[in-house]
Curated annotation (Swiss-Prot):
Cofactor dependence: pyridoxal 5'-phosphate
Family to which the UniProt record says this protein belongs: Belongs to the class-II pyridoxal-phosphate-dependent aminotransferase family. Histidinol-phosphate aminotransferase subfamily.
UniProt name for this protein: Histidinol-phosphate aminotransferase
Subunit-structure text: Homodimer.
EC number: 2.6.1.9
Family annotation (Pfam families): Aminotran_1_2
Enzyme class: transferase
Catalytic reactions of this protein: L-histidinol phosphate + 2-oxoglutarate = 3-(imidazol-4-yl)-2-oxopropyl phosphate + L-glutamate
Gene symbol of the encoding locus: hisC
This protein's pathway: Amino-acid biosynthesis; L-histidine biosynthesis; L-histidine from 5-phospho-alpha-D-ribose 1-diphosphate: step 7/9
GO biological process: L-histidine biosynthetic process
Sorted UniProt keywords: Amino-acid biosynthesis, Aminotransferase, Histidine biosynthesis, Pyridoxal phosphate, Transferase
Length: 360
């Protein structure tokens, strides 16, 4: 009798990732504020570029992503040869774990960190190690204390998701200074465009050989449905990651749309301007209702309620009004709701709904 087919150790320990909901029973067209998407969608230039690319769908895309990497390099001042493009920054995170962590190795991430970090670590056979945060902020001292001889990777999202908090460059540098030789620091910059005065780790990456940053086109660029992201790091790391990257991991449409999106600086700047104004209005309105909110450095707000029951009641009330937000219980925040900053009229609906709940 042959042995049963079994997956690799650790695979069945992976909890399925739960994305933001998009449907509510009884509401044909709900307001979705659960996935931190750009409410204005992609740049019109990106939409046109994708439409133009459809006619070439019978052709394989370029394998080196040279045009997209050149556009990223030009707009963001990065070295094109130090960029790797992936199917969202998620794929780059998986590449890093596959290449640099395995059985017997540890991958550190923070208490309320992005759920993909432990998934990618377990998929590579490594052990994810959660490190406590300090009032929903990355705690550098706790991370340094958590480093062991088995530590290979440290992931921090800055700004963080789902908390929207961030630490400054001085704290990030202090963490990088404390890394042992065998350890890589990965700065997840999915929301970095929304954080004023922060380079996402660019200067730190370029000054060291053990720091990598990741970025995505899913947030400010409004291309979550295309799945495009990239990593920026030392040449030796990027060359290693490219060895396991599929040659055609990005479609021709994705490459065309992402290149046009990154080049449409005016569209991006206008989206950022509206987000900053509306974020401040949303935070102010929530605080006036007695809800605690940390200052947000992203395109969403984490509202804290008096209890888990109060958060559940607010979530249910918003759903009855046709509004979907994210209840981040799986992130250890049962008394919170994460609310994407929407269009002005969207945010007005949220505040009106919660005002009615408080007044009831």
């Amino acid at each position: 009798m042959t042995a049963p087919i079994r997956p690799q150790p650790g695979i069945l320990d992976i909890a399925l990732y739960q994305g933001g909901a998009s449907k509510i029973a009884g509401h044909a067209d709900p307001l979705k504020l659960s996935s931190n998407e750009n409410p204005f969608g992609p740049s019109p230039a990106a939409v046109q570029a994708m439409a133009d690319a459809v006619a070439s769908s019978h052709r394989y895309p370029n394998t080196d992503h040279a045009d997209l990497r050149a556009a990223i390099s030009e707009i963001h001042g990065l070295e094109a040869d130090n960029i790797i493009c992936g199917v969202g920054s998620d794929e780059v995170i998986h590449f890093l774990c596959q290449c640099y962590a395995g059985p017997g190795d540890e991958v550190l991430y923070t208490q309320h960190g992005f759920g993909m970090y432990p998934i990618a670590a377990k998929a590579a056979g490594a052990t994810p190690v959660q490190v406590a945060e300090d009032a929903r902020h990355v705690d550098v001292d706790a991370l340094i204390a958590g480093i062991t001889p088995a530590t290979r990777l440290i992931f921090i999202a800055n700004p963080s998701n789902p908390c929207a908090t961030m630490i400054d460059n001085g704290e990030i540098t202090r963490l990088a200074d404390a890394l042992p030789d065998q350890c890589l620091l990965i700065l997840d910059g999915a929301y970095v465009e929304f954080a004023d005065g922060y380079d996402g780790g660019k200067n730190l990456v370029e000054a060291r050989d053990n720091v990598v940053m990741t970025r995505t086109f899913s947030k400010v660029y409004g291309l979550g449905g295309l799945r495009v992201g990239y990593g920026y790091g030392p040449r030796h790391v990027i060359d290693t990651l490219n060895r396991i990257r599929g040659p055609f991991n990005l479609s021709g449409m994705a490459l065309a749309g992402a290149e046009a999106a990154v080049r449409d600086v005016d569209w991006v700047n206008e989206c950022l301007r509206v987000n900053a104004d509306e974020r401040a209005r949303l935070v102010g309105g929530l605080r006036q209702l007695g809800l605690a909110c940390d200052d947000s450095h992203a395109n969403f707000v984490l509202a804290r309620f008096a209890s888990e029951a109060a958060a559940d009641a607010a979530d249910a009330h918003l759903k009855r009004d046709g509004i979907i937000v994210r209840a981040p219980k799986s992130y250890g925040l049962p008394d919170c709701l994460r609310i994407t900053v929407g269009r002005p009229e969207d945010n007005s609906r949220v505040l009106a709904s919660l005002t009615a709940l408080v007044a009831a």
